[in-house]
Curated annotation (Swiss-Prot):
PROSITE patterns: SSRP
Gene responsible for this protein: smpB
GO molecular function, one term: RNA binding
Domain of life of the organism encoding this protein: Bacteria
Protein name: SsrA-binding protein
Family to which the UniProt record says this protein belongs: Belongs to the SmpB family.
Alphabetical list of InterPro entries matching this protein: SmpB, SsrA-bd_prot, SsrA-bd_prot_CS
UniProt source species: Ehrlichia ruminantium (strain Welgevonden)
Function comment: Required for rescue of stalled ribosomes mediated by trans-translation. Binds to transfer-messenger RNA (tmRNA), required for stable association of tmRNA with ribosomes. tmRNA and SmpB together mimic tRNA shape, replacing the anticodon stem-loop with SmpB. tmRNA is encoded by the ssrA gene; the 2 termini fold to resemble tRNA(Ala) and it encodes a 'tag peptide', a short internal open reading frame. During trans-translation Ala-aminoacylated tmRNA acts like a tRNA, entering the A-site of stalled ribosomes, displacing the stalled mRNA.
Gene Ontology biological process: trans-translation
Keywords: Cytoplasm, RNA-binding
Subcellular location: Cytoplasm
Length: 148
């Protein structure tokens, strides 16, 4: 598994409820740009239309060697999942406080682009502070154990 890009803010801003692996419908120039890692996942999210899941605001830069028929960098991209998974995700999206965001994009062992999408619930400010305290304590603990 070759990770292309990870959205690190997801783990800090949200509680992760459940994870899913989804395929992404891409065109050729988008795959080439992904291989060059010219992608931004920070503002992206998942929406549901007609019982299909779409990845919105995923910015894949235009491929420089492509001809004039290049892709739109922020177009919505269809996610490929099993129907049972789509029903589960769309049901959770309708609940208050839950949202679906991509955690990271990767190429699997066969070289196919995939997205790890997660159902999340937003953290409050005090939860974020607890996360920072735990991270700082773990860092301090490892320094003490190393003898530094």
């Amino acid at each position: 598994m070759d990770i292309i890009i990870e959205n690190r803010k997801v783990r800090f801003n949200y509680f992760i409820i459940q994870e899913f692996d989804a395929g992404i419908v891409l065109i050729g120039s988008e795959v080439k740009s992904l291989r060059q890692r010219k992608v931004s996942i920070a503002e992206s999210y998942v929406t549901e239309r007609n019982m299909e899941l779409w990845l919105c605001n995923l910015h894949i830069s235009e491929y420089t060697q492509a001809n004039t028929k290049n892709h739109n960098p922020t177009r919505p991209r269809k996610l490929l999942l099993k129907k049972k998974q789509i029903y589960k995700i769309s049901g959770n999206m309708k609940n208050d406080g839950f949202t679906v965001v991509p955690l990271f994009l990767y190429f699997n062992d066969k070289g196919i682009a995939k997205a790890k999408i997660v159902i999340v619930k937003g953290k409050k400010l005090h939860d974020k502070r607890e996360t920072i305290k735990a991270r700082d304590w773990n860092r301090e603990k490892s320094r003490i154990l190393r003898g530094g």
